Curated annotation (Swiss-Prot):
One of its GO terms (molecular function) is microtubule binding. The gene is reep3. GO terms for biological process: cell division; endoplasmic reticulum tubular network organization; mitotic nuclear membrane reassembly; nuclear envelope organization. This is Receptor expression-enhancing protein 3. The chain crosses the membrane at residues 1-21, 42-62, 68-88. InterPro entries: TB2_DP1_HVA22 (IPR004345). Belongs to the DP1 family. Its main location: endoplasmic reticulum. The keyword Transmembrane applies. It comes from Danio rerio. Residues 177-256 are annotated as: Disordered.
């Protein structure tokens, strides 16, 4: 653990910060020699960073691994050894010069393929998003429709029945009319007429003579048949045959 911390500190300070500061001074003073030197160092250090990442995952268990890494970084920076310049001139420059065209072609192809890949991924993402949006809209519309349908059924089946029953129960006149049998309302007016007639006294022929006597200006009331009462059936009216009234003349004729 201590070796790892020391090696990381050396790489960060001597491998990154120190060369970065001297690169700044080379650019500021426009010293071509120093500029070329630090450019070669950054190329070698980029390759070192790639190798270090792989080595930390594979051979970090190797004894003295972190000590070797510290020594290698110091060797690259030392003005006496100039390790970065040696590696660049002996290995990297010849290799990059021979593979430069192939590397350029690979970079161009990678750019084109990456662009096509990004476009395809973008189209697929938009298609998936549109499908998800349409599905969500359809599901939401179906849920809203079912909810409205349930509300409509409730309004049509429950609320009117309750209101009708409550109005029927709370209105005695309406309840009495609805409880009457069919056709009873047509005879309601006849009962009033009959009550007026029934309230008057009805006499037989002998009683009419004995009780009231005979008068020229007044006729004697006699019993009428039940057919005298009007029996209404809708707009039709059936009347019984009227018997002639008894007066003094007709009574004398009947006695003789």
């Amino acid at each position: 653990m201590v070796s790892w911390m020391i090696s990381r500190s050396v790489v960060l300070v001597f491998g990154n910060l120190y060369p970065a500061y001297y690169s700044y001074k080379a650019v500021k003073t426009k010293n071509v020699k120093e500029y070329v030197r630090w450019m070669m160092y950054w190329i070698v250090f980029a390759l070192f960073t790639v190798v270090e990442t792989v080595a930390d995952l594979t051979i970090a268990w190797f004894p003295l691994y972190y000590e070797i890494k510290i020594a290698f970084v110091i060797w690259l920076l030392s003005p006496y050894t100039r390790g970065a310049s040696v590696i660049y001139r002996k290995a990297l420059h010849p290799l990059l010069s021979s593979k430069e065209r192939e590397i350029d072609d690979y970079i161009v192809q990678a750019k084109e393929r990456s662009y096509e890949t990004m476009v395809n991924f973008g189209k697929q993402g938009l298609t998936i998003a549109a499908t998800a949006a349409v599905s969500a809209a359809v599901k939401g519309q179906g849920a809203i429709t079912e909810k409205l349908r349930s509300f409509s059924m409730h309004d049509l089946t429950q609320i009117p029945q309750d209101d009708g029953y409550s109005s029927y129960a709370s209105n005695p006149a309406r309840r009495a009319i609805m409880d009457q049998p069919d056709g009873a309302e047509y005879y309601h007016g006849d009962d009033d007429d009959r009550s007026d007639e029934d309230s008057k006294p009805v006499f037989s022929e002998d009683e009419a003579v004995s009780h009231h006597g005979l008068r020229r200006s007044q006729s004697v009331k006699v019993t009428r048949s039940k057919l005298r009462r009007d029996a209404r059936y809708g707009s039709l009216k059936i009347k019984g045959r009227k018997r002639p009234g008894i007066n003094a003349t007709t009574y004398s004729n009947m006695e003789s």
